[in-house]
């Protein structure tokens, strides 16, 4: 699902609300399992979502800062995602190191060593590390904000391929993408917002730029993102 025509602050807040990082003033956020049973996420923070066994991953717009810690190496950044699941009082670096090595090979992160601070990497390689780490959690829901902003063309194709692979596995990928051509090619459904409300939800396989453009200028239709 692609979210179109939200203001930058709204895009950030919308995804953060689903991830439990932003409180909502009204409404609901319901996650349906394979049997159609709903779990209400509104009012739950990210720790509560994790403890509830809800498999949700988030690739934020802010790669260095909110997503990764720039002064840490790849292994330590993998540990940011795994330390809560440890049963021992001692931190286990074997699993995170193995994951770091795996991500270095695929999606082919260009770095002299997994021990190098991620801040020394290019923007594209930083994004590969972040996306690779989140996908490795085998999420049911993957939230992605501007996955290819500021990266080169080759890295963009790698990121789109990774997102497509997740979609084919049955993962619910909810993303914000700036390029409408990519949106129409990549997404099954497109939710268009106008004035902070959903003005329409279109089938990505049949929607046109003209239809999306019309929805960007009105908000009478309304809708529920499901």
Question: What label would you give each PLM region?
Answer:
Residues 1-226:
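Glycine-rich phosphate-binding loops of nucleotide-dependent enzymes
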């Amino acid at each position: 699902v692609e979210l179109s025509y939200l203001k930058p602050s709204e895009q950030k807040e919308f995804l953060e609300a689903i991830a439990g990082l932003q409180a909502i003033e009204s409404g609901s956020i319901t996650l349906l399992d394979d049997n159609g049973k709903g779990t209400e996420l509104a009012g739950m923070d990210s720790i509560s979502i994790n403890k509830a066994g809800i498999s949700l991953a988030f690739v934020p717009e802010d790669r260095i800062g909110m997503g990764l810690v720039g002064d840490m190496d790849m292994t330590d950044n993998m540990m940011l995602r795994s330390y809560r699941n440890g049963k021992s009082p001692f931190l286990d670096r074997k699993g995170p190191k193995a994951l770091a090595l795996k991500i270095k090979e695929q999606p082919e992160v260009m770095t002299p060593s997994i021990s190098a601070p991620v801040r020394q990497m290019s923007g594209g390689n930083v994004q590969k590390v972040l996306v690779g780490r989140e996908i490795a959690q085998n999420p049911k829901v993957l939230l992605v904000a501007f996955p290819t902003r500021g990266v080169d063309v080759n890295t963009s194709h790698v990121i789109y391929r990774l997102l497509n692979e997740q979609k084919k596995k049955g993962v619910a990928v909810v993303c914000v993408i700036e390029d409408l051509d990519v949106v129409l090619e990549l997404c099954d459904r497109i939710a268009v917002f106008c004035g902070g409300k959903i003005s329409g939800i279109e089938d990505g396989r049949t929607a046109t730029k003209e239809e999306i453009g019309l929805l960007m200028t009105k908000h009478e239709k309304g809708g529920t993102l499901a």
